[in-house]
Amino acid sequence: ERTLQVLDYAVLVISGREGVQGHTVTLWKLLQKYEIPVFLFINKLDRDTADYEAVLKSLQERFSPAVCDMSFLTDSAGTDGGSVPEQLVMLAAEDHEEILEQYLDGTLNAAGMEESLRSMIRSGRLYPCMGGSAATGEGIDRFLQMFYRFAVTDYREEDPLRGIVYKVRHDSQGERLTFVTLTGGQISVKDSVDGEKVHQI
């Protein structure tokens, strides 16, 4: 649970065969508790009994109506394979009336919605979902392209060094290993760090 607190985004993987299970619900509640933006991937779609649509509907009913199928996206360059789903338009139009206007006059595409979608994902008002198979690789590249396209952070390398220590353990020789996620600046091998604080550098 401590590790979850340093995540910028999370990818929650759900089986396309078994659907939402007990551990899925537990993870979802923890992600909501720490207000972590979530991308969803429905896995095992290469199996005969897998059902993407059924699992997607279950996620919308059990987790949030803001879970939205993003399968119409095809690449990271703004070339999208289909029309923007009405569900996505309605969610985005709550904050941006111009999106609804563009949708009604037929000029709307995902490339024109990118900033709105990034903001919605980051604030937990949209949970993008795609499907595929980790075993065969089907859908993985498309999902990662979507993730890189819409997952953004504010960290800057030129800022003063700061970070959060989220785990400390010892290796087989008894040496202490400290796991840190940086939230600003940069650090290199053999750098010395001064001015430590509890849970922070």
Please name every model-derived segment.
Residues 1-201:
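Structural and coupling elements of P-loop NTPases
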